[in-house]
Structures are given as C-alpha cells and as structure tokens.
C-alpha cells in the first residue's frame, strides 16, 4: 500500500509511517544479534568475540547498501510526491542497475581483502580463523543485502513501511531457528551461523524484489520508460554518495575503535560485542525514524509544502524521546539480564564490561536521538554537506578521545566515555545546521540547494514550488 506523506497531521503521519519501520529495523538487527547470541551460547565466548569483531568490518558493506537505499529512496520519493511516475520508474530501474555493478565490485574486494583487514585491526589469534570464515560467507550474501535495501528504500519512498516489516518478521524469526539448527543440531560452528543468515536474507530479498516490480508496474505512465539513465544515476548519486562516504567513514572509525578494543583481550571484545548490539538496536531505531523523516521531507518538498517540513522536526523529536524513556531505564538498570542472552557467566569480566558500556552511553540517548532527527531533515532537503560535517566531527572526536583515554589508567573505560562527548558535539552542530539551513530553505529553497551543489535537483524543486504557489493563488 502506497502512502501520501504530504497530507495529514505530521505527528500522526510520521507515527503511522515509522512504526512498521521500527519493527522492521528491530527484525533486521535480529539477524546479527541472533548470530552473536547463538555463537555465544552454543559455541563459546571466543565465537561471540569473532562475530562481534567481524561485525565492524561488515558495516563497511552495509554503508554502501544503506547509501544506495537513501539515494534511491529520496529521488523516488520526490518523483512520487510530484506524481511524475515515468521519471519515478526510471529512477527505480537505474538505482537497481547501478547498485548491482557496485555490489559485484565490493564482493571482489571483500573476498580478496578481508583477511588482511582482520590482521590489520589486531584481531587476536584465537578468534582470527573464525572471524575470517564468518566474513567470507557474509560477503557471498552481499547481493541479497544490496537488493533488499533498494527494495525497502522504494517501499519507503512510496509511503509503504508495512510490506518490508512483514518480510523481515518472518525472515528474522526463521533465522534464529536456522541458526540453532545449523549450530546446535548440525554442529557447523561459526560457519553455521553465517550460512543461516545467508539463507534467510536471500529468501527475504527475493520476496521483496518480486513485490517491488509488481508495485512499480502498477503505476500508469505514458510514453517510453527508460531502464537506465546516466542523468538519473547522477541525481541518485548526489544523495547516495555522501551517504556512502558518511557511513563508510563511520565504519572506518568503528574499525579503528575495534582495533583499540582488541588490545584488551577476548573478554573485553566479547563484552563490548554484546553491549554494542544492544546499543545499535537503539541507534538504528533512531536512524530509521530519521530515514522516515527524510522521505516525509522529500515528498513534501516535491509537493511544494515546505511548511510541513519544519513541523516534521518537532513531531520526530517527540517520538524519539518517547522511545528514549523506557530504553534508558531498561539498559541502565536491567542491562545485565539482556547481556546474559549472549553469554553464560553472570559475574565474569565480559559481562562487567558490557554493563559499564551501557550505563555510560544510555543516558545520552536523549541527545543523539535529536541529532538523528535533524540529520533526517537535512538529508531529505539535499543538504548533505552539513549532514556530513556534523557526523564526521562526532566520529573524529570519538576515535581521538578513545585513543587518548584508553592509554591512561582508565583503560577500556576511556573508550566508552568517548561516545557521549562525540554525540553531544555532533548534536550541537546538527541543530545549528538545521536551524540555519531550514530557515533559508523555507524562504529561499533554490538558493540553499544551489549552495549545496544540488543543481540538478534545484530545477525540479523550483518547479514544484512554483506549481504549489500557483495553486495557492
């Protein structure tokens, strides 16, 4: 079902649109959490550390898939909001072809270079072989991840957040069962964990793509629809490339952090691996709402309803704060019970490390959630430079502070303390950019977009605004 995000009360529209997206991202996170949970419970602490260590490298591939998702989603959303269905179809087909080429290149790089990267980040010898095996199988499944992300981006652009939720719910729950079957039943070890994810993501991807093509063909268009357009690829790339660079930069920063953490041994790696999975569920949920706001913003820009963009920020902020309250209480006071899902020793150094991580970070969810809402609007408006500056500043500070403090008497605790500092400064920057840029965008959308180098999209935005003004007159 397609949904028009340009009408209705913003808070209600965002809630109805984003609620299934929250469910989808929770099930998406269950893929990696299930891998860690089964590895830790049925194989051992070293297996948990191996999956967690590999996860930071997989984030590089996820960054490219996520960037393709955002680029496709924003452009498709804009044409859908403007009712220009022929261009919308061309943007869909172009995004799929471009993503396929990128995926093939990344598979080659991954299969040839992951082993060297594992050694570069100080992976302990006792988990090196398992980490390499997990990554090799993961890379083989990249096409499934890429095309599924493109599919979800298209669904979101059309205002449909329920369809991907249904696919992921079934696939993620199946993944848990297949994980246990392969590891506990067939005794496949770490390979069983990876192959289970490969299989279930493949099923989810195929189903999603079938529905996407049916949905797109249902739109009536006149004239020839191009299957590929270099001009359209350029428009998608204007949004996708900054997102890919931003996410890749974040991934590289996380890999540097992982290399610092690896110097403290397998127990600290295991504790961090479990805790960061819980943390990522929260951050990814906030990011998902930000993505929803990006689609909301883009559709309303396409329809020339810039006043609704500003209203979307307040509605989004209130939604994430409602989520923060129970999550902070749960992680701060009851995090140990959640960590025990991943490990068997309730008193060991691994669980103590994870609990300290959660207690340091969780109170600052109220801060970083605001940043991610503001970032969503900046992306939806095409103000990618501002978005990237705020994100890069956060990460650079986090890595730098972690490197310095970890070398002091604080040890690994100093690494965890770096997160809140980076979040606070990054949020301040995002808010400054949001307040200044969105005011200019409301008054002079053409000038702001040109200042950001979005020349191709500026003309379309100007036409949308002109049409809206004529309707008002």
Language model features: what each stretch is:
Residues 1-18, 76-141, 185-241, 297-364, ...:
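Short alpha-helical transmembrane segments in multi-pass integral membrane proteins
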Residues 60-63, 175-180, 204-209, 281-284, ...:
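Hydrophobic transmembrane alpha-helices of multi-pass small-molecule transporters
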Residues 39-59, 125-130, 190-191, 232-239, ...:
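Interfacial/gating helices of multi-pass transporter permease domains
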Residues 11-30, 34, 57-64, 140, ...:
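Residue-level signal for short hydrophobic patches within transmembrane helices
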Residues 30-49, 118-125, 181-188, 248-277, ...:
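Helix-terminus/linker motif at the lipid-water interface of multi-pass membrane proteins
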Residues 69, 138-156, 164-175, 193-206, ...:
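Short runs within selected transmembrane alpha-helices of multi-pass transporters and secretion channels
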Residues 48-108, 145-164, 271-335, 368-390:
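Small-residue-rich hydrophobic transmembrane alpha-helices
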Residues 16-35, 137, 148, 171, ...:
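Transmembrane helical elements of multi-pass membrane transporters/channels
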């Amino acid at each position: 079902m397609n949904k028009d995000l340009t009408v209705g009360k913003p808070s209600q529209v965002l809630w109805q649109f984003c609620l299934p997206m929250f469910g989808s991202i929770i099930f998406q996170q269950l893929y990696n959490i299930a891998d860690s949970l089964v590895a830790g419970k049925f194989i051992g602490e070293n297996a948990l550390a191996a999956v967690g260590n590999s996860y930071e490298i997989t984030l590089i591939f996820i960054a490219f898939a996520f960037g393709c998702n955002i680029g496709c989603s924003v452009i498709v959303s804009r044409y859908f909001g403007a009712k220009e269905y022929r261009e919308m179809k061309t943007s869909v087909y172009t995004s799929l072809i471009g993503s396929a080429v990128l995926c093939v290149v990344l598979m080659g790089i991954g299969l040839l270079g992951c082993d060297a990267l594992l050694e570069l980040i100080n992976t302990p010898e006792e988990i090196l072989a398992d980490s390499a095996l997990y990554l090799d199988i993961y890379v083989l499944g990249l096409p499934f991840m890429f095309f599924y992300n493109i599919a979800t981006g298209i669904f979101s652009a059309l205002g449909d957040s329920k369809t991907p939720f249904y696919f992921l719910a079934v696939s993620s729950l199946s993944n848990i069962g297949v994980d246990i079957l392969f590891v506990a039943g067939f005794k496949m070890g770490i390979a069983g964990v990876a192959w289970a994810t490969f299989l279930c993501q493949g099923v989810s991807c195929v189903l999603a793509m079938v529905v996407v093509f049916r949905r797109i063909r249902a739109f009536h268009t006149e004239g020839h629809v191009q299957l590929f357009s270099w001009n359209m690829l350029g428009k998608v790339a204007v949004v996708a490339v900054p997102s890919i660079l931003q996410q890749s930069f974040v991934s590289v920063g996380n890999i540097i952090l992982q290399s610092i953490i690896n110097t403290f041994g397998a127990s600290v790696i295991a504790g961090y691996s479990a805790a960061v999975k819980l943390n990522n569920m929260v951050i990814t949920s906030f990011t998902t709402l930000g993505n929803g706001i990006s689609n909301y913003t883009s559709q309303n820009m396409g329809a020339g309803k810039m006043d609704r963009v500003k209203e979307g920020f307040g509605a989004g902020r209130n939604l994430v704060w409602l989520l923060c309250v129970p999550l902070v209480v749960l992680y701060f006071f009851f995090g140990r019970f959640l960590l025990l899902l991943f490990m068997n020793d309730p008193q060991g150094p691994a669980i103590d490390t994870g609990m300290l991580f959660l207690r340091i970070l969780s109170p600052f969810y109220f801060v970083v959630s605001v940043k991610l809402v503001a970032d969503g609007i900046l992306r939806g408006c095409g103000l990618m430079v501002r978005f990237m500056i705020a994100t890069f500043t956060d990460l650079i500070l986090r890595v730098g502070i972690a490197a310095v403090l970890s070398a002091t008497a604080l040890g690994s605790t100093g690494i965890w303390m770096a997160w809140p500092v980076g979040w606070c400064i990054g949020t301040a920057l995002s808010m400054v950019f949001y307040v200044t840029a969105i005011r200019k965008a409301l008054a002079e959308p053409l000038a702001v977009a040109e200042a950001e180098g979005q020349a191709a999209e500026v003309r379309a935005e100007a036409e949308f605004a002109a049409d809206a003004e004529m309707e008002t007159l």
